[in-house]
Design a protein with these regions (language model features):
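Conserved histidine-centered catalytic loops in small-molecule metabolism enzymes
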Residues: 280-308
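Active-site ligand-binding patch in enzyme domains
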Residues: 105, 111-247, 255-258
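Zn2+-dependent cytidine deaminase-like catalytic core
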Residues: 2-95, 259
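A structural microfeature
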Residues: 1-2, 128
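Short, charged, surface-exposed secondary-structure boundary motifs
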Residues: 13, 73, 98-99, 194-196, ...
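Short acidic amphipathic segments
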Residues: 256, 260-268
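Short internal beta-strands
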Residues: 59-67, 184-189, 206-213, 268-276
Length: 308
């Protein structure tokens, strides 16, 4: 009789949208509402979802997973039961955990869900030794590249190191797909990245992580000063958490990607193997595990999961 989903932080939750989508509200007192995540019971950016369920006298609520957010964490279920509503918990729990993996990682591990992504040649390089232009050298095919833009639209932030910006001058935006541009997180220890690089434009917010202090930029650029040491990956995760970033896709370069692998600070890795060879160049990161392999025409996509 109705359905809904949570479109954006600060906007109505899935339960609210689902209830409002029902044209004949007289059906609600004999309905069942199915939710992937426990309905909230607190006043945050939006009113409690529990209040609306109770108001419309919906008698049955089926919950996929309990909300790990300490503000909720079972209080929503308790509130519904106290108001005479039958609550069933744990239906399709694995599927709901997968659906909400970014949210759960953010609240349980106090860091974003981290996805590593790169493309490498058949002989294991992510870039040739030299190139003529300050732009990416394409390794993967057009289908693979479109998929990358879809991924960018699904994550809250995208991260690259200094050398990737200097070598490729990437836009780090969403093209070839519909969606919002992710927040750009850029590592720039010594201040090599100037305002004429694409990552410094106003098409998206940029968080610049640097060892420099007292830097001033335009309003869309935030500078975070840290010491670049062995704890850098943890500091990046902490800064992302500080700004409420629930997911990050890391697109390079080799040193940046390898540092997250060696710190075991990643959740997924998505590796394209393109149908090209360089014979020499920048070696691809080294990652262990048994991937799932997907064919994308002449490309291969290797998918790794780093489960606890």
């Amino acid at each position: 009789i109705g359905e809904g989903w949570h479109r954006k932080a600060g906007e109505p939750h899935a339960e609210v949208n689902a209830i409002h989508s029902v044209k004949d509200k007289s059906l609600l007192p004999k309905a069942t509402i199915y939710v992937s995540l426990e309905p909230c019971s607190h006043h945050g950016k939006t009113p409690p979802c529990c209040d609306l369920i109770i108001k419309h006298k919906i008698p049955n609520v089926v919950v996929g997973t309990v909300d790990p957010n300490s503000i909720v964490a079972g209080t929503g279920i308790k509130r519904l039961i106290e108001n005479g509503i039958t609550v069933t918990v744990g239906i399709l729990e694995d599927e709901c955990n997968e659906l909400n993996k970014r949210f759960f990682t953010f609240h349980n591990k106090k860091r974003p869900y981290i996805i590593l992504k790169w493309a490498e040649s058949l002989d294991g390089f992510i870039a040739p030794l030299t190139k003529e232009k300050q732009e990416p050298v394409w390794i993967s095919n057009s289908i693979s590249r479109q998929l990358v833009h879809k991924w960018r639209s699904e994550e809250q932030a995208i991260l690259v190191g200094t050398q990737t910006v200097i070598d490729d001058n990437p836009k780090l935006d969403v093209r070839d797909w519909k969606g919002e541009n992710p927040i750009r997180i850029v590592l720039d220890r010594t201040g090599k990245i100037t305002n004429d690089f694409h990552v410094m434009n106003k098409k998206a917010k940029t968080i610049l992580i640097t060892a420099q202090e007292n830097l001033t930029f335009s309003e869309n650029i935030i500078a975070e000063s840290v010491i670049f040491d062995i704890q850098l990956t943890k500091k990046i995760a902490d800064i992302s958490y500080k700004y409420g970033i629930q997911s990050v896709i890391i697109e390079g370069g080799r040193q940046t990607l390898q540092s997250f692998i060696e710190a075991n600070l990643w959740d997924e890795a998505r590796v394209f193997i393109g149908a090209v060879s360089f014979n020499d160049g920048v070696k691809a990161p080294v990652i262990n595990g048994i991937p799932k392999i997907v064919k994308l025409k002449e490309d291969q996509l290797k998918l790794y999961n780093n489960h606890d």
